[in-house]
Amino acid sequence: MGRGKIEIKRIENPTNRQVTYSKRRNGIFKKAQELTVLCDAKVSLIMFSNTGKFHEYTSPTITTKKVYDQYQKTLGIDLWSSHYERMQENLRKLKEINNKLRREIRQRMGEDLGDLSIEDLRGLEQKMDASLGLVRERKYHVIKTQTETYRKKVRNLEEQHGNLLLNFEAKCDDPHYGLVENDGDYESAVAFANGASNLYAFRLHQAHPNLHHDGGYGSHDLRLA
């Protein structure tokens, strides 16, 4: 019993479709290799899967470029002429745009003004005024932003300074703050001078009897540490 006819249509299942593609691609490449060996044919195959993956086979006796060159020579056509002409046209347009932009830059620098009409000069003046306005607006924005930043820093420093002063004054109001008994000596660690936050340390020592005062420090003297 003969094999039934297989209907040729797109395989819907992606996995089955990929498996079939791989098998038949390998079969075609095998046939191309057989043609190259058995018949001394020059074969070039290029294949792209539905996912865009590229595969090719070229006979060892020829290159892909030689195949294209022989194809063009045989048919009398040029595959690259139209593409080259489009590239040349795009290059010409880009050069024109570049030259125009360079000319506008020179004119805004005060150069190449001799060929401009009164209308062109007025238009250039308006463009430069608009550009100047944008630059000035940006400058003021930067100045304002920097000023606000500096003001915030100053306020933070003033707040820190105020907190330090309050903390210092609170400690100074404590009669026991800064006085520590140390083997009969007493040390004062904090004092204000002329309202500033300069810190001095005073020590009471039992030496130097010539500095004693009646009813004063008794057997202690006061000196700057």
From Swiss-Prot:
Give a brief account of the tissues where this protein occurs.
Answer: Expressed during flower development in stamens, petals and carpels. Expressed in fruits and seeds.
- What are the residue boundaries of the MADS-box domain, all occurrences included? 1-61
Residue limits of the K-box domain?
84-174
**A molecular function (GO) term:** DNA-binding transcription factor activity, RNA polymerase II-specific
Q: Which Gene Ontology BP terms does the record give?
A: flower development; positive regulation of transcription by RNA polymerase II; regulation of transcription by RNA polymerase II
InterPro entries (alphabetical): MADS-box/MEF2_TF, MEF2-like_N, TF_Kbox, TF_MADSbox, TF_MADSbox_sf
Please give the superkingdom of this protein's source.
Eukaryota
What Pfam families would the database entry show?
A: K-box, SRF-TF
Q: Which UniProt keywords apply?
A: DNA-binding, Flowering, Nucleus, Transcription, Transcription regulation
Location(s) in or outside the cell: Nucleus
One GO CC annotation, please? nucleus
| PANTHER family in the cross-refs | SERUM RESPONSE FACTOR HOMOLOG
Q: What does this protein do?
A: Probable transcription factor involved in flower development.
Name recorded for this polypeptide: Agamous-like MADS-box protein TM6
In its UniProt entry, the species of origin is given as Vitis vinifera
